[in-house]
């Protein structure tokens, strides 16, 4: 809502000051923080809602938008969009509003009771006409029901599609009377596991079993003083893909982040889109970093064999038991 308010305020002012006085305005660049570094910096559903609204409202206020892309989203060699859902959302918003939802995922935890799940829709004047799981249309009032703007996915349907495989077990495609489709991933997961580690600033990372979850955010404070660490000490939250990022079986902390920390104990708190929050302590002594998990058995020696494990292919998506996905994410050392 804060972002929406900023867009309304800015575009209204531009229209009032310039457009209404017959002075043309072009928005020459727009986007999201870290959007040019990785497609996973901003969660997919939140990304789509931003671009749906800004495209719609720019048209309402007669403000042409210029898409400024470094090749992250538009493949300049093969001339196609890497994310078709993003492209369709933007293009369709030029003609009519697309429907969105408060979330584009439903997390089902291992061994937890599976109940009906409510998803709040933002219909934007449209109506829901169909929900598909693959080629099959879900049966209204049996698999799901709709009451106003509340979509309820029934527990029996969720039970029927959940397997013992961590990650995305199904993707529901919601179709509306106008605009782009909205996808909802059904994700089976367990609490992620962060483990102890010892290494230098250059080599340190946190051995992690994601167990189907997606990494959302990280806070960093000095344990004794409770002050925020750098960079950008005005907030305890650190920038995704600049300070930290997920990879195969690990969370990587940027060497530059570790180097600028003061010696002593630093408390990190990792948030996951499943709702889990896990604390992790690092102790810095010169160039040496020791990581202590709030979950780990500290009588065991740290397993530094992780240092020899290749990064592999990964993405901030819940597609593997421990691995966050399928697309390559470069290591900090190679950037």
Can you say where each PLM-predicted feature lies in the sequence?
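A short beta-strand micro-motif common to beta-rich folds, especially ectodomain repeats
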Residues: 166-178, 264-272
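Surface-exposed, short loops/turns at beta-strand junctions within beta-sandwich domains
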Residues: 157-168, 255-264
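Extracellular glycoside hydrolase catalytic/binding regions
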Residues: 1-55
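Aromatic-rich peripheral "rim/lid" segments of glycoside hydrolase catalytic domains that contact
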Residues: 37-130, 134
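Extracellular/luminal ectodomains and secreted, surface-exposed scaffolds of diverse proteins
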Residues: 136-154, 234-249
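Edge beta-strands of extracellular beta-sandwich domains
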Residues: 180-190, 276-287
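Solvent-exposed, low-complexity, repeat-rich "mucin-like" stalks and linkers
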Residues: 95-137, 194-233
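Low-complexity, Pro/Ser/Thr- and charge-rich linker/hinge segments at domain boundaries
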Residues: 186-207, 287-299
């Amino acid at each position: 809502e804060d972002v929406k308010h900023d867009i309304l305020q800015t575009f209204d002012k531009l229209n009032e000051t310039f457009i209404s006085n017959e002075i043309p305005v072009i928005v020459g660049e727009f986007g999201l923080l870290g959007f040019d570094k990785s497609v996973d910096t901003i969660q997919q559903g939140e990304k789509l809602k931003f671009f749906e609204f800004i495209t719609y409202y720019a048209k309402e206020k007669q403000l042409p938008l210029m898409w400024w892309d470094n090749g992250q989203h538009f493949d300049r060699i093969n001339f196609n969009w890497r994310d078709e859902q993003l492209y369709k959302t933007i293009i369709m918003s030029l003609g009519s509003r697309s429907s969105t939802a408060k979330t584009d995922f439903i997390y089902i935890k291992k061994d937890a009771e599976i109940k009906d799940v409510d998803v709040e829709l933002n219909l934007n004047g449209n109506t829901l006409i169909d929900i598909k799981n693959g080629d099959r249309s879900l049966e209204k009032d049996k698999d799901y029901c709709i009451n106003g703007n509340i979509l309820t996915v029934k527990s029996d349907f969720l039970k029927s599609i959940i397997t013992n495989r961590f990650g995305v077990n199904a993707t529901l495609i919601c179709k509306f009377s106008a605009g782009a489709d909205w996808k909802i991933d059904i994700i089976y997961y367990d609490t992620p596991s962060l483990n102890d580690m010892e290494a230098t600033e250059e080599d340190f990372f946190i051995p992690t079993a994601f167990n189907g979850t997606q990494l959302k955010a990280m806070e960093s404070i000095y344990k004794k003083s409770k002050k925020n660490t750098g960079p950008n000490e005005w907030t305890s939250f650190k920038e995704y893909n600049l300070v930290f990022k997920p990879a195969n079986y690990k969370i990587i902390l940027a060497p530059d982040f570790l180097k600028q920390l003061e010696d002593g104990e630093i408390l990190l708190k990792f948030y996951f889109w499943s709702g889990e929050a896990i604390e992790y302590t690092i102790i810095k002594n010169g160039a040496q970093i020791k990581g202590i998990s709030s979950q780990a058995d500290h009588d065991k020696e740290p397993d530094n064999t992780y240092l020899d494990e290749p990064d592999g292919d990964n993405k901030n998506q819940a597609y593997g038991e421990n691995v966050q996905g399928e697309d390559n994410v470069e290591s900090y050392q190679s950037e």
